[in-house]
């Protein structure tokens, strides 16, 4: 479970890290028991006493065959997030290899999620080959990188990131999820 932390609202005064909250003009009485929880997990649900903030910390790495089905790719991604208890609202971006810039399914997924798609050259993805949970000689021979989904997610998420969902695959696509540093919310 990757929950961040609980914060009592009345303790937020003069805390710069929570300036996003002040700008939202949320009115709460001084005696309120409203609690704020930072979480990327979908199982944490808001209620009248709990405000759930979903920091955008997840990068979805995607690899597909040419002409992959958008419906099947979307199902793979949504099922992966659901099965790992990850909130779609915590997704920051989609990452893939530059050879997929014109891949309809990936571009439609970016539109559906309303998230940017980050493209990397195979040489950039290969720089992190030792960190990968799964690498493939077949993928290397095909696109020039030992991995697309895992590598793209990790490269996009940055140096202090962690792969939290290894490559999950269907007949036409792969996806993996990396989490940006949990330290900086």
PLM features per residue range, with description:
Residues 174-180:
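Short, amphipathic C-terminal "tail helix"
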Residues 183-185:
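Conserved small/polar residues in nucleotide/adenosyl-binding loops
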Residues 132-172:
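Internal helix-turn-beta structural module
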Residues 123-125, 169, 181:
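Short, solvent-exposed coil/turn elements at secondary-structure transition points
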Residues 1-101, 105, 178:
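Conserved mixed alpha/beta catalytic, RNA-binding, or beta-rich assembly cores of soluble enzyme
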Residues 97, 106-147:
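Long, charge-dense
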Residues 38, 118-121, 163-167, 177:
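General beta-strand structural signal in soluble alpha/beta enzymes
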């Amino acid at each position: 479970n990757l929950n961040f932390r609980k914060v009592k609202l009345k303790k937020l005064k003069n805390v710069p890290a929570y300036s996003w909250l002040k700008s939202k003009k949320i009115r709460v009485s001084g005696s309120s028991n409203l609690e704020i929880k930072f979480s990327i997990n979908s199982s944490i649900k808001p209620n009248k006493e709990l405000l759930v903030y979903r920091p955008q910390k997840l990068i979805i790495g995607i690899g597909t065959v040419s002409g992959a089905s958008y419906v099947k790719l979307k199902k793979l991604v949504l099922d992966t997030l659901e099965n790992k208890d990850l909130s779609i609202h915590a997704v920051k971006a989609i990452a893939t290899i530059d050879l997929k810039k014109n891949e309809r399914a990936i571009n439609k997924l970016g539109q559906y999620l309303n998230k940017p798609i980050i493209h990397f050259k195979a040489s950039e993805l290969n720089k992190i080959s030792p960190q990968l949970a799964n690498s493939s000689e077949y993928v290397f021979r095909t696109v020039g990188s030992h991995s697309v989904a895992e590598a793209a997610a990790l490269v996009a998420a940055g140096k202090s990131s962690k792969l939290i969902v290894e490559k999950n695959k269907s007949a036409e696509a792969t996806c993996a999820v990396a989490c940006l540093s949990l330290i900086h919310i």
